[in-house]
UniProtKB/Swiss-Prot annotation:
Protein family (similarity comment): Belongs to the Caudovirales dATP/dGTP diphosphohydrolase family.
Keyword set, alphabetical order: Cobalt, Hydrolase, Metal-binding, Nucleotide-binding
Record protein name field: dATP/dGTP diphosphohydrolase
UniProt GO molecular function: hydrolase activity; metal ion binding; nucleotide binding
Native organism: Cyanophage S-2L (Cyanobacteria phage S-2L)
């Protein structure tokens, strides 16, 4: 059975908290940026385990900050759906500045 986001967050916290109970959001963000940099530079960018490193840190950050990930993603998707989008030169999508941008509640 697939785990919910909250279940994954709890599993990650149960693993990492005993290893680093004093971790702080700033340190987690720094490590997240490091992992993203490695993913970009790596020939393993399509490796699910490398992507998982990034997701584990992002979910741990959300836990540290008290973010309800499911609620935040749904709210952000609603904002993104209301925006106009264009393809950037690197192939990624970017929203067009000034397009509909309601704020997060």
């Amino acid at each position: 059975m697939p785990a919910t986001v909250a279940e994954l967050q709890a599993e990650i916290a149960a693993w990492i908290h005993p290893l680093n109970p004093d971790r702080r959001p700033g340190g987690t963000i720094a490590k997240l940026l490091e992992e993203i940099g490695e993913l970009i530079a790596s020939d393993r960018a399509h490796d699910p385990l490398e992507v998982a490193d990034v997701l584990i840190l992002a979910l741990d950050l959300a836990t540290l900050l008290g973010v309800d990930v499911t609620e935040a993603i749904r709210a952000k998707l609603a904002i993104n759906r209301a925006r106009s989008w264009a393809r950037a030169d690197n192939g990624a999508m970017r929203h067009i500045p000034g397009s509909d941008t309601p704020s997060f509640p």
